[in-house]
From Swiss-Prot:
Cytoplasmic membrane side: 2-236, 185-236, 304-328
Comment text on domains: The large envelope protein is synthesized with the pre-S region at the cytosolic side of the endoplasmic reticulum and, hence will be within the virion after budding. Therefore the pre-S region is not N-glycosylated. Later a post-translational translocation of N-terminal pre-S and TM1 domains occur in about 50% of proteins at the virion surface. These molecules change their topology by an unknown mechanism, resulting in exposure of pre-S region at virion surface.
Function: The large envelope protein exists in two topological conformations, one which is termed 'external' or Le-HBsAg and the other 'internal' or Li-HBsAg. In its external conformation the protein attaches the virus to cell receptors and thereby initiating infection. This interaction determines the species specificity and liver tropism. The large envelope protein probably also assumes fusion between virion and host membranes. In its internal conformation the protein plays a role in virion morphogenesis and mediates the contact with the nucleocapsid like a matrix protein.
Biased composition (Polar residues): 76-88
Subcellular location per the Swiss-Prot or TrEMBL entry: Virion membrane
Name of this chain's protein: Large envelope protein
Region ranges (Disordered): 63-128
Residues linked to a lipid group, N-myristoyl glycine type: G2
GO biological process: membrane fusion involved in viral entry into host cell; symbiont entry into host cell; virion attachment to host cell
Organism: Duck hepatitis B virus (strain United States/DHBV-16) (DHBV)
Extracellular side: 2-163, 258-282
InterPro entries named in the record: HBV_HBSAG
Length: 328
């Protein structure tokens, strides 16, 4: 029960041919959206159809269709050529057997046999190989031969001079001192700008701090110079921070215009600054020590001079440093 008769080879070939034709014919039917109008196939569908038909024609010309497989698409079904089977007569069969028997009798017997070879010994010890002798394989290689001893003169490591260490410490102290004075001067400039800002918004007769009468034991003082402990101290440094941010914003805007160079003003400004830097760099000394001495001298003059002189020296320092950068 439930058993089916076995299919013959011809039936299986016909079924396989039908499956192959179904797969090839499925590629020729357009699938999905054809075009925006839905009437004509797209170029991809046409090319796929042409490629499929070429494959079908190639298989048909080669006679690869099994028997009965061409009925699905109406193609011609050439029958494959059968291989002719050799027909032997009893006399020819007897002659072949006699010839093979004589060949076996006249064949020379095997006299020598090759004994099975033992696996090679990859690890050779000194004395096992006559070519090596008492030396190992690494010792005979020219890359591993020991070179004659060369006398090496060892020099003691150079001790650091005391002057170099002292110079580094002195340079660090000078850097800290200059940074401290620069911070003080920046705060002083910010306080002057804060004072100018307050003078524009307050009358001259009312420049006293409004927080000195809040009950704290603080001596009378002006706005912008509040000591530690006065409630106006935090407001003063808040104004200084806002002024500093405004200066950074203006500087960033100028740098943006200078880097882009999209406006005529930026191009003219860059051309004038380049000409100024080139003229200043031509006047600067080429010795690095002289340049460092010049910059240090200008810094000392700036830190110990009045406001007008400080402004001029600051501009000179900026021009000098910019010229150094432009020259390098």
């Amino acid at each position: 029960m439930g058993q089916h008769p076995a299919k013959s080879m011809d039936v299986r070939r016909i079924e396989g041919g039908e499956i192959l034709l179904n797969q090839l014919a499925g590629r020729m039917i357009p699938k999905g959206t054809l075009t925006w109008s839905g009437k004509f196939p797209t170029l991809d569908h046409v090319l796929d159809h042409v490629q499929t038909m070429e494959e079908i024609n190639t298989l048909q010309n080669q006679g690869a269709w099994p028997a009965g497989a061409g009925r699905r698409v109406g193609l011609s079904n050439p029958t494959p050529q059968e291989i002719p089977q050799p027909q032997w007569t009893p006399e020819e069969d007897q002659k072949a057997r006699e010839a093979f028997r004589r060949y076996q009798e006249e064949r020379p017997p095997e006299t020598t046999t090759i004994p099975p070879s033992s696996p090679p010994q990859w690890k050779l010890q000194p004395g096992d190989d006559p070519l090596l002798g008492n030396q190992s394989l690494l010792e005979t290689h020219p890359l591993y031969q020991s070179e004659p001893a060369v006398p090496v003169i060892k020099t003691p490591p150079l001790k650091k001079k005391m002057s170099g260490t002292f110079g580094g410490i002195l340079a660090g102290l000078i850097g800290l001192l200059v940074s401290f004075f620069l911070l003080i001067k920046i705060l002083e400039i910010l306080r002057r700008l804060d004072w100018w800002w307050i003078s524009l918004s307050s009358p001259k007769g009312k420049m006293q701090c409004a927080f000195q009468d809040t009950g704290a034991q603080i001596s009378p003082h002006y706005v912008g110079s509040c000591p530690w402990g006065c409630p106006g101290f935090l407001w003063t440094y808040l104004r200084l921070f806002i002024i500093f941010l405004l200066i950074l914003l203006v500087a960033a805007g100028l740098l943006y215009l200078t880097d882009n160079g999209s406006t005529i003003l930026g191009k003219l400004q860059w051309a004038s600054v380049s000409a100024l830097f080139s003229s200043i760099s031509s006047l600067l000394p080429s010795d690095p020590k002289s340049l460092v001495a010049l910059t240090f001298g200008l810094s000392l003059i700036w830190m110990t001079s009045s406001s007008a002189t400080q402004t001029l020296v600051t501009l000179t320092q900026l021009a000098t440093l910019s010229a150094l950068f432009y020259k390098s």
